[in-house]
């Protein structure tokens, strides 16, 4: 995970450069303290981790988490190379772990900051064999962690029609969920991303000229269903709630948590957690009354930034 998430059909990287969305804004809100201890909860390709490490310096400690061992390998090479070439470099520890386990092994009030960039990385999207994108045909996998048992193929082929429709509606906010679920069940078995995308596209075909005019302005008809399956397979929203619940326990007073999300389901969870943490439990001071979004310049350079929203809070 990490370094941006997208529900757009392109499934491309960050303008080809792997620069994370809202990089400057995220680092500014994190307010890295030299010599501190920070957690990058979604290492991805190491873009955020690199910027944090540069500011930490040799006395500091950066802990990086990711479900995806392939992402950790890429980030590890980058960060290790920097550690060799730059003398003032912090200790870096990379762990194959979900951000839901952010508090594992951490003592209370010992962390200066937590950063989480939620969703799919370009490394995952661009690999057809991972099954995250319908832009290239591949197996219906969608697991961020290959150790997980549940795959998108199992979900698509084994949930009953009602359960499948509920998943598509709840996690994809897809208003045509029942029609799509019915088409999927009738088309079983479905083994590939291309087959699934074709089934969804046919099921979501506009019913009249007015709807057709509206649909032409929309995203690809399979986008929301693919999002729903990915979230369900990886338990993404449950993991996000676990992270937000654990963060106050491990943060020092004055420590910050910064979260970048890419769709309304995630943003709503972050917004509610920060607001409740500030008003009910009194352990957060919200730093972003409204979510921070990408500048027009960044959006022009990287269309994936258009849906990004950053929220930040400080431990009190």
For every predicted segment, state its role.
Residues 1-316:
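S-adenosyl-L-methionine-dependent methyltransferase catalytic core, i.e., the SAM/SAH-binding region
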